[in-house]
Amino acid sequence: MQKIPLTVRGAELLKQELQQLKSVARPEVIEAIAEARSHGDLSENAEYEAAKERQGFIEGRISELEHKLSVAHIINPTEIHAEGKIVFGTTVTLEDLETEEHVTYQIVGEDEADIKQGKIYVGSPIARALIGKEEGDTAEVQAPGGVREYDIIEVRYI
């Protein structure tokens, strides 16, 4: 079974979501189903159908989260001994050579990725171009608009 890479923070967020689904959402939907049942005929009960649909979503998400956490390979960036190389979990500051803008990204797992928060998926084109590089190197990224070049300004393990 293939391991799913997660940062410590990413694993914690999945655990929190799982706990919320089990302790809050699941009991609420069970109560909503019971309430809808009390209204009688289930064949034309939209409230019942909606609650059952929501229950299916919740149970599916619980199963998905339990599976991901069971196969997670949790990586703590502060414990990485990568000798300055960019690896999973690394936070890296780049300079776009065309615009001279600086951007900072953390390379994370698929479930953690959020470009608005500066978290990029390890399988994304930019992350793949950065992996293995060091401070001072230049990375070429194949983007939809063509090749972009970035200087690697800083590599941190935080």
UniProtKB/Swiss-Prot annotation:
Transmembrane segments: none annotated. SUPFAM superfamilies: FKBP-like, GreA transcript cleavage protein, N-terminal domain. InterPro entries: GreA/GreB_C_sf, TF_GreA/GreB_CS, Tscrpt_elong_fac_GreA, Tscrpt_elong_fac_GreA/B, Tscrpt_elong_fac_GreA/B_C, Tscrpt_elong_fac_GreA/B_fam, Tscrpt_elong_fac_GreA/B_N, Tscrpt_elong_fac_GreA/B_N_sf. GO terms for biological process: DNA-templated transcription elongation; regulation of DNA-templated transcription elongation. PROSITE patterns: GREAB_1 (PS00829). The keyword Iron does not apply. Residues 46-66 form a coiled coil. The keyword Transcription regulation applies. It comes from the Bacteria. Keywords: Coiled coil, DNA-binding, Transcription, Transcription regulation. GO terms for molecular function: DNA binding; RNA polymerase binding. HAMAP family: GreA_GreB. Necessary for efficient RNA polymerase transcription elongation past template-encoded arresting sites. The arresting sites in DNA have the property of trapping a certain fraction of elongating RNA polymerases that pass through, resulting in locked ternary complexes. Cleavage of the nascent transcript by cleavage factors such as GreA or GreB allows the resumption of elongation from the new 3'terminus. GreA releases sequences of 2 to 3 nucleotides. Belongs to the GreA/GreB family. This is Transcription elongation factor GreA.
